[in-house]
Amino acid sequence: MSAIALTVSMLALVAVLGLWIGNWKIYGVGLGIGGVLFGGIIVGHFAQTYQIVLNGDMLHFIQEFGLILFVYTIGIQVGPGFFSSLRVSGLRLNCFAILMVVVGGLVTAIIHKLFAVPLPIILGVFSGAVTNTPALGAAQQILTDLGSPPQLVSQMGMGYAMAYPFGICGILLVMWLIRLFFKINIDREAKAFDSSYGQNRELLQTMNVAVRNPNLHGLSVQDVPLLNSDEVVCSRLKRGDLLMVPMPATVIEIGDYLHLVGQRDALEKVRLVVGEEVDVTLSTAGTALQTARVVVTNEAVLGKKIRDLNLKQKYDVVITRLNRAGIELVASNSASLQFGDILNLVGRPEAIEAVSAIVGNAQQKLQQVQMLPVFIGVGLGVLLGSIPLFVPGFPAALRLGLAGGPLVVALILGRIGSIGKLYWFMPPSANLALRELGIVLFLSVVGLKSGGDFINTLVNGDGLAWIGYGAMITGIPLLTVGILARMLVKMNYLTLCGMLAGSMTDPPALAFANGLHPTSGAAALSYATVYPLAMFLRIMSPQILAVLFWTL
C-alpha cells in the first residue's frame, strides 16, 4: 500500500473510532466531536508501536485544511449575529464572556511562570481546558512562526488531550456548584425569565390604533413622519368595512384603524400621536387581502433597499417583517435585502405572486451551495492570515494565521451577505457538514501526532500535572464569572448557564443547560448572544499569549 493510501486509511480509522467514542455518554454527557482526538491518540500509539510510517507532509496539509474549513464555516454561521451581539442588548453578557477569557489568560500566565511550564505545553493545556480546538491550531501556528522547536509544538496536542476531559466535565460541575451554593430553584428561575423576557425582549409586536388626532385628518401617510420611520411599518388600514394596504399617498381620516408593526416602545410613540390602541381585528381573513411569507433568492435584488423595489406603488404590497438568520427585523425602507431573507407580505393574491417572482422565492435554492464564494472566502482568509504585522521589540511578525484570517474574513462576509451575484449564505446542513468534516480532519491528525508519546507522558511524565493545570484554567474563570454574575447583577441562573457554555464555546454544556428546564429558551438565547465574540476571542487569545510570553 502506498504512503498516501495508508495515511488516508489511518485517518478514516481514526475518524470512525473517534466518532464512536464521542457517542459514548455517561449521565447524558459525552466527549462529542472531541472523541476524535482520543481515537487519534489510540491509533497513533499503536502506529508507533508497530512502526507504521505515515506521510508527514500530507498529514500537515490535512490538519491545516481541516482547521481552515472549520473556522471559515463558523465565521459564516455567526457572522450575521456577530456585530449585532455587541450592541446594547447583549453588552452585559458579552462583557462577562470577555472577563472569562481574560481571567483564563491570567490563570494560564500565572501557571506558566509559577511552575515553569514550557510555553507550547501550557498553550496546549489552555486550549484543551477551554475545549476550543481552533485555539489549539492557532497556537501551534504562531509558535511555529516564532521558531519554537517542532518537538515541543507537536506535544501541544498531548497537553490539549490531558486537559480536554475536565474541560467538558468542569463546566457542568461549576453549574451544579453555583446552583447548590445559591440554593436556586429552577422552575422559579424559568418563570422569572419568561416574565422579564416577555416585557423586555426586542421581538416585533403589532398594535391596532384608531386615528383620533384631528390634526392628522386629511394628511397623507407620507406626510406623517412617525408612519414613515425605520422603526414602524403601517401594513393595513381599515375604513368602515374596507381593508386596504396604505399607499404613501393614502389620505388618513378620523376613525381609521391602522395596523402597525414594530418594537413596543416605537409603537407607543406612534399611538401617542395618532390616537388610541383598540381591540379591533384587522385580519385579512374574508377580505381581498392575504398574507404570505416569501424568501429572497433572486440575485437581481440582493443588496437593494426595500424602497428601491417600490412594491407599494407598483403592486399595492407592503413588507411587514423581515426575518434574517432567525432574527425578526422591522422592514424599514432603508433595509437591504440579503439572500435567504424571509419577508412577510400583505396584499392581493395576484400582487403577492408578482412580488414573489421578483424576490425569487425559490425554496430549492436555499439547499444549494455556491462553491465559488466559498473558495473566494477561504482564499481571502488565508491571504489575510498571512499578512505580517511587524511590532517593534517582537521577535517575529504577528499574523492572524490560518485560524484567525479565515475567521475574520468569514465574519465580515457573513455580515455583508452578498456582493453582486455572489452570496455567502450557506444552508445550515451544508455549513454543518463542512464544519464537522474540517474539525474531524484536524483532530484526527492532532491525535495521530500526539498518540506515540501520550501513554508514556501520562504514566511516567508530567501528564497528571498537566491535568491539574487544565482543571485550574477551566474551573477558576468559570467560578469567578459565575459567582460575580449571580451576586453583582443577579443574573438569571438559566441565562447564566447559557452564558458560561457560550463563553466556553461548548455545545455539550449548552445541551446540559437546556436540559435543566426543557421548555425555557433562556440558556440557548444567552449562548447564542455570546458565542460569536467568545469564539473570536478564544482563537485570538492563545496567539496573544504566545507573543507576550515569547518576548518576556
Swiss-Prot record:
Protein topology in the membrane: Multi-pass membrane protein
InterPro entries membership: AAE_transporter (IPR050144), RCK_C (IPR006037), RCK_C_sf (IPR036721), Transpt_YidE_put (IPR023018), YidE_YbjL (IPR006512)
Name of the featured protein: Putative transport protein YPO4083/y4100/YP_3992
TM annotation in the entry: 1-21, 26-46, 65-85, 96-116, 119-139, 158-178, 371-391, 393-413, 439-459, 464-484, 493-513, 530-550
RCK C-terminal domain span: 192-276, 279-361
GO MF: monoatomic cation transmembrane transporter activity
GO biological process: potassium ion transport
Family classification: Belongs to the AAE transporter (TC 2.A.81) family. YidE subfamily.
Pfam families registered for this protein in UniProt: Asp-Al_Ex, TrkA_C
GO cellular component, as recorded: plasma membrane
Location relative to the cell: Cell membrane
Top-level lineage group: Bacteria
Assigned keywords, A-Z: Cell membrane, Membrane, Repeat, Transmembrane, Transmembrane helix, Transport
